[in-house]
Amino acid sequence: MKTIAGFSAAAILCAAGASFAQDYPTKPIRVIVPLTPGSGADIAGRIVAKHLSDALKQPVLVENRPGAGGVIGTQALLNADADGYTLMVQSASHAANPAIYKTLPYDPLKDIVDVALLGMTPYVMIAARGGAYPTLKALIDAAKAKPGQIPFASAGVGSSTHMAAEYVAQVAGIKILNIPYKGSPEAIQDTIAGRTAFYMAPINTAIGLVSEGRLAPLGISSRRRSEVLPAAVPLAEQGFPAYDVTLWFGMWAPAGTPPAVVQRLNAQVASVLKNREVVEQFGKLGIGPQSMAPEEFGRFVRSEITTYQRIVKQAAIPQQ
């Protein structure tokens, strides 16, 4: 009798969840972006939110909650009800944070549900045009001559731009000095001024700066050249075949969000990413739309967490 009762209770819960998902959403959805306005995650999140709103017939409102590498915004997500009406769009920093912080106020594998991958984009190593390092070789030679003294800009300790630069150092066998800034704008300004040797900028940030002649591309992190910035030669073609790094963006929900809602969101996001307008908007920014089922995305996130832990350990980056 207990077994039958337990089975019946489970069946009722499943039916209730399916019914909830079928009616979902019945009110506006909030999407937290734990990074600054204008960041890659913010831009990608807003593009997806607009078209997701059209698909779901409900407003999808983006709210920026930057700070502490995304930790503050992530906490805001976890303080919300797990009902599918509060989501988060974040970058690869989500996977780097467990390696950067000694203790996080949440468990990224247990407290957060992986909903969907949105897209991937390469980094561009940009330096002051006409500056001290006109080529990648010149930069690496200088770093070998002065270990740990050549400064590079990052959008904060543990940011994806920091990790991408540290990985350059590891594959090139050099030591460089991280100069962390509050965000990308400040990092770019000092790179333009020549106060830092380079900045690993997401390609959507680099496109305008390079076309305006304010910065020069020393290389791109992907194995292939980008159509939107063909002047950037892959690091893999400049003597570092192992270097292949991309910045990615994803969507998450609080743990406890009904699985049927997660599946519905994933399916809708996958559909949005095939929309011609979205493909064109992403393409102009150098972002490749890419979708994964929730389970596959979860495996991807776990592998990225492991990768960042290795980078942090090898670079001996002090935990915050």
Language-model features: where?
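A ligand-binding cleft/hinge motif common to bilobed small-molecule-binding domains
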Residues: 94-103, 169-171, 198-232
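N-terminal signal peptide c-region/cleavage motif recognized by signal peptidases
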Residues: 16-18
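Hinge/capping helix and adjacent helix->loop/strand transition within the periplasmic-binding protein
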Residues: 79-85, 99-186, 235-237, 248-281
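Stable alpha-helical elements in mature extracytoplasmic
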Residues: 40, 44, 48, 52, ...
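N-terminal (or domain-start) structured segment
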Residues: 21-111, 149-151, 157, 173-197, ...
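Bacterial N-terminal signal peptides that target proteins for export
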Residues: 1-8
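An extracytoplasmic/periplasmic, membrane-proximal ligand-sensing/linker region
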Residues: 26-28, 211, 237, 259-320
